[in-house]
């Protein structure tokens, strides 16, 4: 039978309806200096409910599995107790002792973010040294930092495994903590085998065949696994990395209904652990928990008007509130590059009078981009730049959808559909974080509205965005018309004028036109890649490719074949023509 944890005084004081617990960080047992720093310098007045449950468990030394909604403070839930325990260690931790805590994250941007939080946490404990290693960075410089010693190491799996295999100066015999942050994302990115190899190297795999190889005492190593969603891959990772773990947030609805504490300790029987995890996975897949303060909307637009309406909504947002941060999610890297160019460079005349010389930027704020094909330096600049701005737009692929906590993001626009409902949850999780208000907007074509039913099945309910009202608020040719007949969005004067401006901008330069063509081709390829039941909703056969081209500011539909393919196709047709037997001319008979 699974052993139950008694309900702590802290848990009794929790505000069950809200995000925050009614206790303080001091009540959780953290060092007074660390608590004062959290409140005075980092601005954390009270722990979230997840932090109130996880921090005491993390300090107890037990393995832990945490399932919590995005934006609930999972990073602090493991970093704060690690810093607390390290600063108390006697004799004092030195750099030559090597690495004590390892945090594994899925992306480079999340690596930088966790490193930044760790830096702030150890500010008053100067002998603790955080550091990071990740793909794209200079390996020799990382090797030098590892040689000097890093107390708290944040890493992406691929680069960590590389150093474990090839960097002899990497000192980790004292490693006490291994943290899997955003574990579901790590596994979805294909790092499952790398994680198993890492656990083998560090002697933390729960295989009986490896017990004799493990030189460390089993009780000295504590593994923590944190995830916003659960699936079979996460289940397997938990089975091989966690031993008798404390479970947090996995069965809140069930436990509350029975009046039981939802934090429980499992038995040593791995089959029982697996069975318990499977039950939890089935429950978790059916429903996703989203912040109550998140306003979710959808906008239904025809394909050809998508770009003009995106620009209109962004302009409306920034005119409504000057200090605004927005993340726009797109499906491909090429699409990100194209839309970044349009948003940052498109100029227009007041009232969209194209014949006037007085022009200004359509979007006045800074625009950043983020995707996996960018150079590491450019990715870092974009991530840090957008984080530091008070008013900005970030256009990004799903590389920014997991774990990243951009300050003060008020709106998420899913311009391209996320596909799986779990991805929708991760995207909208970039706003309405830690109790703050936020809004999320999903673009859908008329042929895609069945996707709303799929989201409803997973607990996400969206209302329609008042697009007509927003369009009518903009003047055309310097005049604001007060009475307008109900017309289709495609024929709206504002949309028609803006579409002409977009097509003029895109076709004015060859470089911009090439960006648009590449974005068009990659978008169509991505649209065909939807899996399972979603293929019935997102059917490429139902698309009008001419209208898709229009959504990239193109007047004509580009060929979906590359230039080399076109040349080969023409060559093949010529060869086939030559190989055909020549037709005999019919000579009319003489009469």
UniProtKB/Swiss-Prot annotation:
Top EC category: hydrolase
Residue ranges of every copy of the Helicase ATP-binding domain listed in the record: 55-248
Location of the Helicase C-terminal domain: 293-482
Bias (Basic residues) ranges: 568-591
Subcellular location: Nucleus
Stretch list, region Disordered: 562-591
Entry keyword annotation includes RNA-binding: yes
UniProt entry keywords in alphabetical sequence: ATP-binding, Helicase, Hydrolase, Nucleotide-binding, Nucleus, Ribosome biogenesis, RNA-binding
GO biological process, one term: ribosome biogenesis
Factors inducing expression: Induced by auxin (NAA), abscisic acid (ABA) and jasmonate (JA).
Reported tissue expression: Expressed in flowers and pollen grains.
Domain observations: The Q motif is unique to and characteristic of the DEAD box family of RNA helicases and controls ATP binding and hydrolysis.
Function: May play a role in organellar ribosome biogenesis and suppress 16S rRNA maturation.
Family: Belongs to the DEAD box helicase family. DDX31/DBP7 subfamily.
Protein name: DEAD-box ATP-dependent RNA helicase 17
Native organism taxonomy: Eukaryota, Viridiplantae, Streptophyta, Embryophyta, Tracheophyta
